[in-house]
Amino acid sequence: MRHTYSPPLYHKQFLSLFQTLQTAVPAITAIEVFPFIAYSICMKYFSNEPDLQTTLLNRFVKYVKVWTESSSENADKGIQPSTERQLSFAKNLAEEIKEIGLKEVQVTEFGYVYAVLPASKGFENVPPFCLLSHMDTVEEVTGKDVKPIIHPSYDGAKIDLQCGVSLDIKEDECLAKAAQQNDTIITTDGTTLLGADDKAGLSEIVSSLEFLVSHKGIKHGPIEVIFSPDEETGHGMDRVPLNLIKSKFAYTVDGGHIGELESECFNAYGATVTFIGKSTHTGDARKKGMVNAICAASLFLQSLPPAERPETTDGYQGFFAVLGIQGSVEKAIVNLILRDFSEEGMNARIEKLKHFAISSAESYGARVDVEFKAQYKNMKGELEKNPEVVQNLENAYKEADVGILHTPIRGGTDGSRLTELGIPTPNIFTGGHNFHSRYEWASLSQMCAACDVLISLAEIIAANGHKNKKK
């Protein structure tokens, strides 16, 4: 069953109107807001289908324009939210969902938005479930002053943006598929990221709940929502209000391509390797026994297997990733992350890193200290203990006519940490692509499909809960 509609965008009427008005007003360019306004007008007057699609696009464009970049430096110090802009966005989001009709809406002191969509009449005793997405964007690529560009009825032509950024179907298989369907896609102007990670997820959750509020015929149980800060820093679940959450299972909406259903992820550790050397006057270095910590650190970096880096691995392969290095002759510090899908593989990776560090230090007569910090665990084991959580989701994909792609998450989500805390939480696709980059784009039809899945999921869980109640 399809609750939303993703037509072959756009209608001939839209294209005609768009071309006529752009000719009449040459100052209006594709980078500005005109295409979006024209899109809304045409969908209102030329389409007989439900306009959740328009509402969804509207909301997404609004959200990505808000700067919500998080700060790893602050988050690592325990500051949450790590930036005030996230808290400001959270407060606005809370007001929006309150107006839609959600109840118990609140923003915690740490910037989490919590709310509940009350159950349909007669479904109050259906077990609740929780939907989650995160409000922040990464700091590696700026998310300030995002200027989204809407490309209606994308035909596969190369898209040239600013700063030398271009999108080409020859280099992007998912983009090629979008072109085959004449999909509407949303990109940046090339100067920033887009923020589909995870404002696509935010938009889809809010739009789906709004749809349920206005369509009383679709029955559902109570649905909780959590919108979290600082997911991109790895601290998204540090202060999640578990005392408020009544759900025994949940779903993050933070994936990528349509159909992706993610129920396993990396085991993740951070590592800090500190080499201690000895400084002397360089003119007396041999006599005084200089020990250069930078040289030991350099040898350590060369010891890491080239075939086990992020850029040389995919699928179920783990890796070592160097994130930063700073140092002097006396002290050099290397910060890394380790990723592996199995516990055995992670344990072996930890031992391997220790060996590389110790042997590199010994080669230069330096001392070394290696510290590891667990970040999150693979959620596969816990989800296998609760198979109905994924089964409900698979049924929702089928009900929404979405093919299922079981893919491992080469990273983590708030759901992986929440699963570790006792609430099994698989991940749902959003229709966003090329995250954390100026090449990021989103597919409107795939975003609509995510809404279909969420609405179907609510129906399925309600039906199962209602059936069990009658027994």
For each feature predicted by the language model, list its residue ranges.
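Short terminal hydrophobic/aromatic SLiMs and anchors at protein ends
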Residues: 5-14, 40-41
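His/Asp/Glu-rich mid-to-C-terminal helical/loop segments that flank catalytic regions of hydrolases
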Residues: 45-46, 52, 291-310, 344-356, ...
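Acidic/His- and Gly-rich active-site-bordering loop/insert found
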Residues: 46-185
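A short beta-alpha structural unit
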Residues: 77-81, 318-326, 337-342, 367-387, ...
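Acidic/histidine-rich catalytic neighborhood of metal-dependent amide-processing enzymes
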Residues: 177-264, 309-323, 327, 334-341, ...
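Glycine/charged-rich beta-loop-alpha catalytic/anionic-binding loops adjacent to active sites
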Residues: 179-192, 276-280, 400, 432-436
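Metal-dependent peptidase/peptidase-like ectodomains
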Residues: 238, 242-295, 343-398
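An extended, acidic, His-containing surface patch that forms the Zn2+-binding/catalytic region
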Residues: 371-471
